[in-house]
């Protein structure tokens, strides 16, 4: 089962996301601020991070920057900041998608599935093995 980290300080939105993601078959953990997010990230393996921008302690851009220093785990930003400048900043930090609030839960669930599908295909392609006679080459 794939594991998703929700980083959202609005408890109503966090609970809504948690409920719908569990219903969709995902394991879910949640953080209320950037420091808690980094603590959970360092102690667990996540397949995807759903990240708000406006967070206490460390904002979502800062969290993304810290994560990208050590991992290419898929990140979807989910935020009320819908301006072009914020979206460009997120994309420059290599987020996989940038979704503005308010959002459609069914569309979000499908975008998460698409990002996870692409991520798993990339990982599978990265572990190819070529065999020739008695030689095996792990790519």
Placement of each model-derived feature along the sequence:
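N-terminal/domain-start alpha-helical segments
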Residues: 1-122
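A structural micro-motif at secondary-structure boundaries
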Residues: 130-139
